[in-house]
């Protein structure tokens, strides 16, 4: 499999999701423009799913269908899955993570599974707190770190630190929140705007 690039938006929303619910397992879907085999997979966005209903298949089906429709309209595909375990020192994908990632890989063979490393998930991490896995046959194995690219790691690091200090994670909406109150926006356009504005303020353009 080829290179994977993680955007500031995708990385930021994963971290904010885990930070909003630090004592719970959280998960979500990774989105990317459709690519041909061998091309760089650019993870441009993510959709936070659950923090309390992770194992409820009915809820998952509803979420997957809605995200797939929305992503298609935006010219994107569901290209992966992210998961943070509730236990601080557990970075291994459990049965649920493997099941959902495997299902995504059935439709998108180049899909990746990202496990968040809770120990490294601090306001100002020195290294990316993520473990990227790829599907090889029937197993998910760590991807060669030389093939995991960052559009701008330092910018992503600074942005997430600033957002966390500003408590932006309190405004993140996952699908659980949306199911409790359908007025809440699981696409997180408000947060997307904050991320875009932050990036624009650092490089001179939005």
Curated annotation (Swiss-Prot):
Principal subcellular localisation of the protein: endoplasmic reticulum
Domain MPN: 4-139
Single GO cellular component term: cytoplasm
Source organism superkingdom: Eukaryota
CDD domains reported for this sequence: MPN_UPF0172 (cd08060)
Topology class, membrane: Peripheral membrane protein
Single GO MF annotation: membrane insertase activity
Calcium recorded as keyword: no
GO biological process per UniProt: protein insertion into ER membrane by stop-transfer membrane-anchor sequence; tail-anchored membrane protein insertion into ER membrane
InterPro entries: EMC8/9 (IPR005366), MPN (IPR037518)
Pfam families the record matches: UPF0172
Keywords: Endoplasmic reticulum, Membrane
Keyword Membrane: yes
Subcellular location: Endoplasmic reticulum membrane
Family to which this protein belongs: Belongs to the EMC8/EMC9 family.
Job of this protein: Part of the endoplasmic reticulum membrane protein complex (EMC) that enables the energy-independent insertion into endoplasmic reticulum membranes of newly synthesized membrane proteins. Preferentially accommodates proteins with transmembrane domains that are weakly hydrophobic or contain destabilizing features such as charged and aromatic residues. Involved in the cotranslational insertion of multi-pass membrane proteins in which stop-transfer membrane-anchor sequences become ER membrane spanning helices.
PANTHER family reported in the protein's UniProt record: ER MEMBRANE PROTEIN COMPLEX, ER MEMBRANE PROTEIN COMPLEX SUBUNIT 9
Assembly: Component of the ER membrane protein complex (EMC). EMC8 and EMC9 are mutually exclusive subunits of the EMC complex.
The protein's name in its UniProt record: ER membrane protein complex subunit 9
Organism: Rattus norvegicus (Rat)
Lineage of the species this protein comes from: Eukaryota, Metazoa, Chordata, Craniata, Vertebrata
């Amino acid at each position: 499999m080829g290179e994977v690039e993680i955007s500031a938006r995708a990385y930021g929303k994963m971290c904010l999701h885990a930070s909003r619910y630090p004592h719970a397992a959280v998960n979500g879907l990774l989105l990317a423009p459709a690519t041909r085999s061998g091309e760089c997979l650019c993870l441009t966005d993510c959709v936070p799913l659950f923090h309390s209903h992770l194992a409820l298949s009915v809820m998952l089906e509803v979420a997957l269908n809605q995200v797939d429709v929305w992503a298609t309209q935006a010219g994107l595909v569901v290209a992966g899955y992210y998961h943070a375990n509730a236990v601080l020192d557990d970075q291994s994908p459990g049965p649920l993570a493997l099941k959902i990632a495997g299902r995504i890989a059935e439709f998108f063979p180049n899909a990746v599974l990202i496990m968040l490393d809770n120990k490294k998930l601090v306001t100002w991490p020195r290294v990316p707190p993520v473990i990227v896995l790829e599907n090889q046959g029937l197993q998910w194995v760590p991807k060669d770190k030389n093939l995991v690219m960052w559009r701008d790691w330092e910018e992503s690091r600074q942005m997430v630190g600033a957002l966390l200090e500003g408590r932006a994670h309190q405004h993140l909406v996952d699908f659980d929140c949306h199911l409790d109150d359908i007025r809440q926006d699981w696409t997180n356009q408000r947060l997307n705007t904050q991320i875009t504005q932050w990036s624009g303020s650092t490089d001179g353009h939005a």
